[in-house]
Amino acid sequence: MNIVPILQNIFSLTNSKNHTIIHFLGLRIKYKHRNIPEQSHPISTYVPGYEIHGQNNKIIIIEENGSERQLLPNEKIDGLNIRINADNSLVRIQKPTKFRDCTLLIENNNCTYDIKSTIYEIGGTIFHLSAPCCKIQIGHNLSTGCGTQINGFSSENVTVSIGNDCMISFGVIIRPDDGHTIFSPESKQILNYGKDIKIGNHVWLGEQVIILKGAVIPDNTIVGAKSLVTKQFQP
């Protein structure tokens, strides 16, 4: 008995240049390969300066007196490596800020990264926007520990917002979608759209907390170490 056709009906894997398609028990999971710009360092490695590919991308610096200006071609933001491979992206950084070994990677069009001033250190954090029209909005006085990631943007028009005076510990992961797309085998409609994440003011996220799509964390909340939050958090 040839069981290969039977196994293929249960599970199969197809690779193309841009996607991997997994068929499993009637579900069709389509995973888009990320188009990461060629670089001599991995994303998690800090490289001083910035690199931009694409059209109409802007990096705006807001000075302490409120005036705004574009980042100069030879200017660096201490502690923050910016890499953009997209069009119409907007980065707004209000001074003062204290980045250390951080990376901002934008890989799709019409994305926004907006961070207010902070007197605390933002350390070892990756901010990664990889789908169109997505946003990361951060209020005043954020602090983060090493290994924190705000990424997983595979759905369009998804926003992660973090309020004022928030403290994020080590190894925290904030993901507004699943990182891949699942389609209905009958209708071909997407089954797992991303959802916004909203973190209020005066929030403390403990070590290795995971915040997933649709999470809402109200003001004045502490989330204990290694907790998983997937919906509106009830303090």
Region locations from a protein language model:
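Short, solvent-exposed secondary-structure boundary motifs
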Residues: 1-7, 41-43, 71-74, 229-230
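Boundary detector for helix-to-coil junctions that initiate low-complexity/charged tails
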Residues: 1-39
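Short, surface-exposed beta-strand/loop "edge" segments at domain boundaries and coil↔beta transitions
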Residues: 23, 27-31, 68-71, 90-92, ...
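Extended, small-residue-rich solenoid/repeat segments and analogous flexible loops
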Residues: 37-95, 107
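Flexible, glycine/small-residue-enriched loop-and-beta-strand segment within the central core
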Residues: 89-215
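C-terminal/domain-terminus segments
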Residues: 217-235
